[in-house]
Regions:
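Pyridoxal 5′-phosphate
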Residues: 1-227
């Protein structure tokens, strides 16, 4: 849940002629991101988290729209059907085959929802909920937390924890039986877990949203307290 100093990292990369790609999966839709001011060259994010879209859709934003990236998948695009080569121009260059139209439409609705509610309002509400959850879990003797209480502007509304004597997957299965959805494991960030010393089993990650109710967090805290 800790926000890294992207601006400083981007400046360091550019100093040595390197470009920087930022995975904004946990921050897109929650905290403001200005690609021009931050120095981000490539920004990618999932659509099903803070942007409230469905799974199976994501976004890639290029700081320089003329930047020609290599492709992983190539195929028909419907725009240059006579050519046997992948188009050079975006976005067709990166959208081979039949695109996920339902996902794009749903993601657009999610982005519109975020824009209407306002990122500042979303961040304030979600971070308040995450802080409440962190305080509740911190009172439980067997719970280990890996960050300080989430505070602006250094955190996103995510709380990672473990329960002493239990694997993260065991905690997740237990909570799942109580209709509480969390994510367990390495969260696609093995290097971060190496830093935390949790690379063997990962952690339990609880993420809040604008739809999270305090009573739901109380249910999570209460369930963990029984372990």
């Amino acid at each position: 849940g800790i926000r890294v100093p992207v601006e400083r990292l981007a400046a360091l990369c550019h100093q040595y002629g390197a470009k920087i790609c930022v995975d904004a999966a946990q921050s897109a839709g929650v905290v403001p991101i200005n690609i021009g001011e931050s120095g981000i060259d490539y920004l990618c994010c999932a659509g099903h988290k803070g942007l409230y879209g469905p799974m199976g859709i994501g976004i890639l934003v290029l700081r320089d729209p003329l930047d020609r990236l290599g492709t992983i998948i190539e195929g028909g695009t419907g725009t240059q059907s006579r050519s046997l080569m992948q188009p050079d121009d975006p976005p067709e260059r990166y959208e081979a085959g039949t695109i996920n139209v339902p996902g794009i439409i749903a993601l657009r609705s999610g982005v519109a929802f975020v824009a209407k509610k306002g990122q500042e309002n979303i961040y304030r509400e979600e971070l308040g909920m995450a802080s409440y959850l962190h305080r509740g879990l911190s009172r439980l003797r067997r719970v280990k937390l890996y960050t300080n209480e989430p505070r602006a502007p250094w955190y996103v509304p995510v709380v990672s924890f473990n329960v002493e004597g239990m694997k993260s997957e065991e905690v997740g299965e237990y909570l799942g039986r109580k209709n509480i959805a969390v994510r367990c494991g390495l969260h696609c960030a093995p290097c971060a877990h190496m830093k935390l010393g949790t690379e063997e089993g990962g952690t339990v990650r609880a993420s809040v949203s604008v739809f999270t109710k305090r009573r739901e967090l109380d249910a999570l805290i209460s369930a963990v307290s029984r372990l």
